Amino acid sequence: MEAAGGLLARARPRRAEAVRLRKRRSVLYGAPGGRRGGGAPGESPRLLALAVALRGLNCALVQTSFVPDEYWQSLEVAHRMVFSYGYLTWEWENGLRGYSYPLIFASIYKVLQLLAKDDVQLLYFCQLCSWFTWYSCTRTLTNSMETLLTIFALSYYPIKGSKMGSSCKYLTLIALAIVIRPTAVIPWIPLVFNHFWQEQKKADLILHNCIPVGLVTAGTSLIIDRVFFGKWVLVQLNFLKFNVLQNLGTFYGSHPWHWYFTQGLPVILGTHLPFFIHGCVQAPKRYHIFLMAVIWTVLVYSMLSHKEFRFIYPVLPLCMFFCGYSLKQLKAWKKSAASFLLLSNLLPALYTGLIHQRGSLDVMSHVQQLCNNSYQSQASVFIMMPCHSTPFYSHVHCPLKMRFLQCPPDLTGNKSYIDEADLFYSNPLAWLNEEFYNDTLLPSHLIFFSVLEQEISSFLALKGYEKSATVFHTHVPQGRVGSHIYVYRKKAEMNHA
């Protein structure tokens, strides 16, 4: 009996430690469905309901634009897939993008079409405590889907010292993320290698998980792209070749190597930054692999000249783990710190979601009105703004004649190449006079940023254009982007529009 009692006494601390581990994982990953958490019964369903309600509100309160890809690489492509009109950018002509992601939205469009419910309001795909997550997560960017799949994958990732992970599930989610956006592989390289290193049955991991998952997802992606491209295209390889190996993304701008460390990561973390640093110092060693994944990802992206905030968005969930661990360690200051984070993120979230850069979307409602009368067949729109500044047919949903300034990169290596948008902005007045040498070529409506108005005012007056709408865009105009967007229409057409 004494021996049995001794064994029982030694087993209790182990069970207590196991319970603590389960609770930590529950806090870290949210314990979906309450299946894997260590909290009270009903806690996870309530948390899930709260999260769904929050994202529903998030969706309603994001009414601004972020970057062109949220429309041009998803909704515009899907619109063309279903309704047979829409614009495909140069990436699609060169096989750098795959149809797997737009197919999600195309399926929704097709259902609406079959139900005869494809009016423009329904075709505005709903863009469902971190301000950057609030700003980005509900957008139709591939980066947002990449981040979402990363979060789900992390919930199944096998942490050292725990047997609660699922190799097949997390590897499947990673594979799906890579199909949608090939750069999703970057943050997972150290995590997968860490898993492989600690895995005792390495051969089983490769033969029973890695190879089957890779073959199924890659095969499905190939078939989907074969159907829509009409030929075999390995878009993931083309994407990596263009953006990583050839580094041709510099055509769209470049930043210094340290930009992600000095601006990118601090901006997307915001007021979470000090908590992130504190959490990195306090977190146990077994969680350092997540910090390594963050550092590795930022370093890799730092080697590429073209940089954007959204590129490192997928590491934000990893950073938030350390922020949460920091709050846990603060104990007496926990509630005050949480209140500070909530209040300090509320203002930038609401401002960027409701006000900043909303003109790009609002102006399309003016364009869409041209579809609602008999004037449609005579109407035409020319968007004289930096290329892809607004959505296109996905937000108009009628075959209206529309045109915009284009800026595809030159893939032939011609160093003297200048795209149409740069040619226009080098001398807008001369470009317009040369392009529209005959009045019959003039569009019925012109759309441009307010900063351009004075420079082309003589052309507008000479050709008989009059301002018909002024749309607010941003409080911080920069370069070619103005504070407002103007809509001009020809005076002779005013009785029809």
Residue ranges and their predicted role:
Residues 1-57, 209-216:
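Start-transfer (signal-anchor) and selected internal transmembrane alpha helices
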Residues 48-52, 214, 219, 275, ...:
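Signature aromatic-anchored transmembrane alpha helix within multi-pass, membrane-resident enzymes
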Residues 56-60, 131-137, 151-182, 192, ...:
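Membrane-interface alpha helices of multi-pass inner-membrane proteins
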Residues 67, 94-97, 135-145, 308-309:
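Short acidic/glycine- and proline-prone juxtamembrane loop motifs at membrane-interface regions
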Residues 73-82, 92-117, 144, 261-265, ...:
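Short hydrophobic/aromatic helix or loop-helix immediately within or flanking a transmembrane segment
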Residues 155-174, 183-218, 277, 281, ...:
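Perimembrane helix-loop-helix junctions
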Residues 262-286, 298, 320:
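Hydrophobic, aromatic-rich transmembrane alpha-helices
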Residues 333-450, 480, 492:
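Membrane-embedded, lumen/periplasm-facing catalytic core of multi-pass transferases
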